[in-house]
A protein has these predicted regions:
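ATP-binding/phosphotransfer module of carbohydrate and carboxylate kinases, centering on a glycine-rich
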Residues: 1-173, 178-205, 213, 250-253, ...
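Phosphate-binding/catalytic loop of phosphoryl-transfer enzymes
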Residues: 141, 217-325, 450-459
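Gly/Ser/Thr-rich active-site cleft segment
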Residues: 202-240, 287, 331, 336, ...
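Transmembrane beta-strands of outer-membrane beta-barrel proteins
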Residues: 147, 206, 281-285
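Short, flexible micro-motifs
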Residues: 155-156, 210-215, 285, 289-293, ...
Length: 459
């Protein structure tokens, strides 16, 4: 197996699952286990696999169940996990998903998103439900004068779009993740909107692409507000985009439709519009890993797709994510953090006091000069990606894969793509024909805000 040169202990989830399947087959007494994640509206996701019998290597059995259940939660979302097939796996997960358990972060996050207490429930085999999917139409509207705003962790982008033509776009550096006062966030967002509006005769709609989880345009969870005290989250943070749109509506004396979507889904939407096709998985590698999906019907599934928190590395000593407290999750493999991590693994010493965005720029500058360590960093991220695509494909039906974000900029992005394709062809030939690509440099940088502009239907 081709491993990252700077991270030799990487143990891809797909390899771990294949090894586990081999172990189960060797044992000869497979136990059928079903995990069901339930979310709002009665929608659910059903995943069935074969496990070892109770009492046979319980530690491995439990770890596989825990990694799979966690992956499903961050792919699909949910406030309830049902378990059928193994009482001991059920008991283990029930203890793990508590505020005192190893999955306390997940419990707190999901109960906040869905505004319901999180629980793990036993199911008899004959009670396992059929899967119930959603498919929601998003975006692709281009009529009128539109503002598209993309709230990145390091810069904010805004576009003014008139009947599908971009008349203005800008990127402005900001620091939302280290700012405690939410009025800073509000004023920065409003300033961006007003700048775009000043380039058009009127404003008909506002579309927003932003990292995090959104329900009815409300901010349920978002890393942009990481430093804002939870007591201030209430209505002030939760309704921030709604309130900005109200202020813009007052300026123009009419109600301006607003649509807020997860930045990952907008990434995928940008790709679907560009490709004129569906089945698009978009991955934006920037401050974190943002993932979105446009299904084969051209809609979104109503899934979280917060794969920044989904495991990609089964190695128990993988790098820890500071926010979730978990190890081996996507945000440390497909983001600027991955570049920094691999640079440090390679013995590189950054100057004191640099922000993560500045550290990325240091490595990008080295890459522009064809520095061998920088090239190795990007190659290793390509190896990570090649081993992760078959794991993601267990949950998403992927025809096209679109790679965006700051990490994919310049020569480094080309190395990631070329390495990924090469390793896929060698190790996973069934994925060799997958269409994986980068948008051109301009749409790479501002494509998100332009796609965001297409989100709302006009009145």
């Amino acid at each position: 197996m081709k491993l990252p040169v700077l991270d030799k202990n990487f143990y891809p989830m797909i390899k771990a699952l294949n090894d586990f399947d081999a172990e189960v087959n060797k044992n000869g007494n497979p136990v059928k286990v079903t995990l069901v994640a339930e979310r709002s509206g009665g929608y659910n996701y059903v995943y069935t696999y074969n496990a070892l019998p109770d009492g046979v290597n319980d530690a491995l059995n439990f770890r596989v169940a825990e990694r799979l259940s966690k992956t499903i939660l961050w792919v699909v979302g949910g406030f309830k996990i049902y378990v059928a097939g193994s009482k001991s796996i059920y008991e283990y997960l029930k203890n793990a998903y508590t505020l005192d358990g190893i999955r306390a972060f997940d419990v707190d996050f999901m109960s906040g998103v869905y505004e319901k207490p999180f629980e793990v429930v036993w199911l008899n085999e004959d009670e396992v439900p059929a899967q119930k999917n959603a498919s929601i139409r998003v975006g692709g509207y281009l009529d009128g004068c539109r503002i598209g705003f993309d709230a990145g962790g390091s810069d904010r982008k805004v576009s003014a779009v008139i009947n599908g033509e971009v008349v203005y776009s800008e990127e402005v550096v900001w620091n939302p993740k280290i700012t405690e006062d939410p009025t800073y966030h509000y004023n920065e967002i409003l300033t961006a909107m007003k700048t775009a509006a000043s380039k058009m005769p009127t404003v008909d709609t506002i579309g927003v692409s932003s990292a995090g989880v959104y329900v009815d345009n409300k901010i349920m969870v978002a890393s942009l507000f990481l430093k804002v005290d939870k007591s201030k989250h209430g209505d002030y943070v939760k309704n921030m985009y709604i309130n900005v749109a109200k202020e813009m509506s007052q300026i123009y004396g009419k109600e301006i439709p607003l649509e807020v979507a997860n930045d990952g889904d907008v990434t995928a939407l940008a790709g679907a519009i560009d490709l004129n096709d569906n089945g698009v998985l978009g991955i934006a590698m920037g401050t974190s890993e943002a993932v979105g999906y446009i299904n084969s019907n051209g809609g979104i599934n109503g899934w979280l797709s917060e794969l920044a928190f989904a495991p990609v590395d089964f190695n128990e000593n993988a790098m820890q994510d500071e926010w979730s407290g978990d190890f081996g999750v996507g945000c440390k493999y497909f983001s600027q953090d991955a570049v920094i991590k691999l640079a440090e693994y390679g013995g590189f010493k950054f100057e004191d006091g640099l922000t993560p965005a500045q550290k990325l720029k240091v490595i990008q500058a080295l890459m522009a000069k064809d520095d061998p360590l920088a090239a190795q960093i990007y190659e290793d991220i390509g190896v990570y990606l090649a081993h992760t695509i078959p794991f993601y494909a267990k949950f998403y039906d992927i025809k096209h894969m679109l790679l965006l974000g700051r990490v994919m900029g310049g020569k480094g992005g080309d190395i990631i793509l070329a390495t990924c394709k090469k390793v896929l062809a060698e190790e996973y030939p069934e994925f060799a024909g997958l269409d994986i690509g980068l948008p051109d440099e301009n749409s790479r940088r501002v494509g998100q805000s332009i796609a965001a502009a297409s989100l709302p239907a006009s009145k």
